[in-house]
Amino acid sequence: DPRVAAISVTTSNNVHLEIAEAAAAAGKHMYCEKPVGRNPTETAAFEACVRAAGVLSLVGYNYRWPPLVQHARALIAAGKLGDLTHYRGNFLVGYANNPDGVLSWRFQRELAGLGTLGDLMSHVIDMAHFLYGPIAQVVGNQHSFITDRPAVAPGTTTHFAVGYGNK
């Protein structure tokens, strides 16, 4: 439909790539919820189809836009906070902390892909990148503390550290 210039992909992760490929082939720009792929291969395929079609895409990192975050970014860019050497990010959410909770697509690896890392920690990583710049190195560990759900990445705690090549 030529009246449609852009689409919003807000489905379960397992169909993000399929929808993106169809939209790109039709010349439609897109906003896609994160993660755009369930694994690095799907993520690279998403980027490739968007680039090949010459359409614009935006990934749904909505925590970039509050005024406080914008102000912090401006202060950092202006050097008003000094030489930053450490970033500590937290993303606290309660929807997945009940072992008896409803089993949704987010807890099924074939549908969700990266589990907690893709669903929640990607916001923390994006915020570090958005505020400070490209990340050069990452060190991390994780532990699943709710193991009674079907094979997924349920109830995972993840810690990671990033290093910046420019500092």
Question: What do these predicted ranges mean?
Answer:
Residues 1-2:
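Short amphipathic alpha-helix with an adjacent loop that forms part of the alpha/beta core around
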Residues 63-167:
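Predominantly a Rossmann-like dinucleotide-binding segment in NAD(P)-dependent oxidoreductases
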Residues 5-6, 12-13, 17-64, 77-79:
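Beta-strand-loop-alpha-helix segment that lines the small-molecule cofactor/substrate pocket
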Residues 5-7, 114-115:
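Short active-site oxyanion
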Residues 10-11, 131:
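Short, well-ordered coil/turn residues at beta-beta hairpins
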